[in-house]
Amino acid sequence: MAKPAATAAAASEELSQVPDEELLRWSKEELARRLRRAEGEKVGLMLEHGGLMRDVNRRLQQHLLEIRGLKDVNQRLQDDNQELRELCCFLDDDRQKGRKLAREWQRFGRHAAGAVWHEVARSQQKLRELEARQEALLRENLELKELVLLLDEERAALAATGAASGGGGGGGGAGSRSSIDSQASLSGPLSGGAPGAGARDVGDGSSTSSAGSGGSPDHHHHVPPPLLPPGPHKAPDGKAGATRRSLDDLSAPPHHRSIPNGLHDPSSTYIRQLESKVRLLEGDKLLAQQAGSGEFRTLRKGFSPYHSESQLASLPPSYQDSLQNGPACPAPELPSPPSAGYSPAGQKPEAVVHAMKVLEVHENLDRQLQDSCEEDLSEKEKAIVREMCNVVWRKLGDAASSKPSIRQHLSGNQFKGPL
């Protein structure tokens, strides 16, 4: 194809370069021959051009098909790109929402942690105050117990002195009535009544006045023994004196029953008093050891010598009798009418009434403190605080699992968190 084209081009150049004089000199045959040859060359060129055009058209068609395919691919890619853009926008919105929620949770966590630590500090402060109060009550209880033992020792000395004075002052032919008068003179001051006031039982079924007649020989020489021990003593003042009088009233034996001869020995009475007090102290110690968290208020009071009615009801009957009526005395075999100088059985001593009032004031204060603590937060607020605590502890646990330093810090402060 390239060779005929080159030949035709060369022929046309030759014809175009041939001058007119040369053409006029040629013959007709030469001109016709050259003309046919030029026409043949033109036909060949036209055929060649047609083939080239078909080739170009075929290639153009192929390119058009490729362009259509690329357009389809481009359209699909654009659709995918649009979907990806929408997905990116959606994810960006979620990211913004997540960041906003994370900031809110951080603020909530800081607020919750502050509230929790504030509550923990308040609880620890209250716990320290309660422990201080408990220690003070325990110290006061120990002092009162020591005072009880001291009073028991003084009473034993007084009883021994009174017994010696009574045994020496009733000599001669006083007989059994002088011993009964000495017993009445010993028991009268201990119970709070005047010596010789009211009726007494002489043991033979008849009752006579403790003062006796003026001409009776057995009562004429009887003098009530002194209640103070020998040696200089000053009267108790303030709280110690009131406590001593209250303990004397509580520990005094009940004299509203007649006492047969031989059962009111001062030493045996003192021993029984000590035994009852030891049993009472052991019962208090056992109850204090067995008291749980629900009996914290009872444990905090330290089981003082004055118990409330609810606490008395929880004690055994022997302890109730010891607390309400004083130390136990031997029961008589034959009861007699009560003496006129003593209060009836239903009436409580003044010291017990005063102790009940003090305990009632303590219980009212404790109830007010408990009510004020419960009124600080409602049930809904308590539930919210618990949920906040759970969230904070979960976040602290996640942080501890990811960072060893936080785990070590939490393990070192595990006893400083809220209860």
Swiss-Prot record:
Keywords assigned: Acetylation, Cell junction, Coiled coil, Developmental protein, Phosphoprotein, Tight junction
Predominant location: other
Residue numbers carrying Phosphoserine: 178, 246
Organism: Homo sapiens (Human)
Function: May play a role in cell-cell adhesion and epithelium development through its interaction with proteins of the beta-catenin family. May play an important role in cortical development, especially in the maintenance of radial glia.
Region (Disordered): 162-268, 307-348
Biased composition (Gly residues): 164-175
One GO BP: cell population proliferation
Biased composition (Low complexity): 176-189
Disulphide connectivity of cysteines: none
Domain of life according to the entry: Eukaryota
InterPro entries according to UniProt: CCDC85 (IPR019359)
Biased composition (Polar residues): 307-325
Descriptive protein name: Coiled-coil domain-containing protein 85C
Subunit field text: May interact with ARVCF, CTNND1, CTNND2 and PKP4.
Keyword Coiled coil: yes
